[in-house]
């Protein structure tokens, strides 16, 4: 993936993280509080139990912010269309869209279902899903 796409994806994720901070939270957190952990299989935990894996792509690494009630998954080898289909499937499973934004290089969405909030940022070949458990 070229540098421009990575920058667009990183910027979109940062915006989504900032927007998610607008809702009331008891636990402060920083996106830099965790190091990436390389994985090759879907992790089983309280966070990933709230969603399902995408049909396409491969999980690449995770960030464990569980002390702050958050967990991030990074995927590779999926098209922007695959990622959009995943967002649509999450909506069909009952997640409501709070907001979304897209441009030529990347897109993102904030979804919520009960006490689970999702921040999803994606571009060609990559997607990041941040899961937050609220309360």
Go through the PLM ranges and name each one.
Residues 23-135:
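An acidic-aromatic pocket/loop used at catalytic or ligand-binding sites
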């Amino acid at each position: 993936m070229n540098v421009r796409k990575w920058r667009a994806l990183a910027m979109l994720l940062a915006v989504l993280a900032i927007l998610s901070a607008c809702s009331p939270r008891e636990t402060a957190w920083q996106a830099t509080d965790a190091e990436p952990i390389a994985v090759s299989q879907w992790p089983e935990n309280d966070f990933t139990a709230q969603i399902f894996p995408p049909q396409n792509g491969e999980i690449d690494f995770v960030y464990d912010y569980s002390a702050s009630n958050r967990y991030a998954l990074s995927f590779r080898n999926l098209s922007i269309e695959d990622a959009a289909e995943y967002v649509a499937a999450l909506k069909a499973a009952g997640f409501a869209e709070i907001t979304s934004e897209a441009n030529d290089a990347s897109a993102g969405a904030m979804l919520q279902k009960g006490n689970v909030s999702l921040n999803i940022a994606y571009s060609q070949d990559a997607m990041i899903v941040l899961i937050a458990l609220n309360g």
